[in-house]
Amino acid sequence: MSRRGTAEEKTAKSDPIYRNRLVNMLVNRILKHGKKSLAYQIIYRAVKKIQQKTETNPLSVLRQAIRGVTPNIAVKARRVGGSTHQVPIEIGSTQGKALAIRWLLGASRKRPGRNMAFKLSSELVDAARGSGDAIRKKEETHRMAEANRAFAHFR
């Protein structure tokens, strides 16, 4: 028997201003080269822009955008008998949120625009309304999973 104790699960920290875990997840994904203060600046500017654009609570817009982009199912490449199949798998809530944040940031980086705060705010507002590249990515993933439903038993 092992003498080691069980490791405690780490809880996701929340950001200092909004005390929100989603904002913290977003900050950690937008982070480049360890510049966390710059990441916070970008997020807070984006939140201000969302407030100006929609005149509603920006955190509810963020939650709605992430809920809209979060996938329920994804495809995973699995090698069976020499050929690779795209096998649909269900995704948990944490992994789904992480994917949604990654897609939102990827879509906002691709957008034409002035700065990252502007692009991120535009993408979040679009995602909350049900349009934008991140939503398209989710729908594409769901289509792939639906098309490869025949391989679901390879899990």
From Swiss-Prot:
Domain of life of the source: Eukaryota
Pfam families recorded: Ribosomal_S7
A GO MF label: rRNA binding
Subcellular locations according to the entry: Plastid, Chloroplast
Assigned GO CC terms: chloroplast; small ribosomal subunit
Predominant cellular place of this UniProt entry's protein: plastid
A GO BP entry: translation
Classification via InterPro entries: Ribosomal_uS7, Ribosomal_uS7_bac/org-type, Ribosomal_uS7_CS, Ribosomal_uS7_dom, Ribosomal_uS7_dom_sf
Family matches, as Gene3D superfamilies: Ribosomal protein S7 domain
Key words of the record: Chloroplast, Plastid, Ribonucleoprotein, Ribosomal protein, RNA-binding, rRNA-binding
Record-linked NCBIfam families: rpsG_bact (TIGR01029)
Function text: One of the primary rRNA binding proteins, it binds directly to 16S rRNA where it nucleates assembly of the head domain of the 30S subunit.
Family named by the database record: Belongs to the universal ribosomal protein uS7 family.
Quaternary state and interactors: Part of the 30S ribosomal subunit.
Full protein name: Small ribosomal subunit protein uS7cz/uS7cy
Organism: Nymphaea alba (White water-lily)
